[in-house]
Amino acid sequence: MPALKPTEFMGRVVWLGVNQDRAAALESTSRDVLSLPFGGPPEESHSGVTRRSCSRVSRQYPKGTEIANTRQVSIVSEEDLALIAQDMGLARIEPEWLGVSMVVAGIPDFSLIPPSSRLQDDASGTTLVVDMENRPCHLVSAVIERGYPGIGKRFKPAARNRRGVTAWVERPGEIALGATLRLHIPDQPVWPHLATARNG
């Protein structure tokens, strides 16, 4: 029995990019096509089948532990970027500032799609697995602050639940600008004890 349900929610790819050296700068550089082998985009500093654990999983592993890399690709929505900009009092937030890999348009509340959802290129079959919501960090604030002094600190609150998701490659291939990604969701109910677990 299939465990994933194809939906009619579609995201159109409106921007692609890579961050080639995150030690040098957070910003990403635009691309027309992303090559996506199993380790993620070869040019991307976040690529690799494994990675060193960071603060996001500090309650699970000592920092620097080698773990599976479920953060190969960072994806945000055009709609969420517009809302972030609006709340910050800016005309626009450029995807480069966030160091993202991809911007999609057309999926509502994109940052909150279920973990383990798939984003599948309808034409090529290239498929990304959503790990979880990406959380806003101070590094983006610093990038914005350079261009808009006094504004950067507004990013974290404005980007709450709008920072997109991280994902990893399940089926290799390419995704190009203009591609259509179909959302496939786990066909299961929400765990009834989620609220209790969060408050525990």
Ranges and model annotations:
Residues 1-118, 122, 132, 192-198:
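Electropositive, beta-rich accessory/interaction domains or terminal extensions
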Residues 104-108, 112-171:
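Glycine-rich active-site loops that engage anionic ligands at enzyme catalytic sites
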Residues 124, 133, 180, 186-187:
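Short, surface-exposed secondary-structure boundary micro-motifs
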Residues 129, 138-140, 187-200:
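Short, Lys/Arg- and Gly-enriched loop/turn segments at beta-strand edges
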Residues 113, 174-177, 181-183:
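Short, well-ordered loop/turn sites that connect or cap secondary structure elements
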Residues 147, 154-155, 167, 180-185, ...:
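Acidic/glycine-rich phosphate/pyrophosphate-binding loops and surrounding catalytic core
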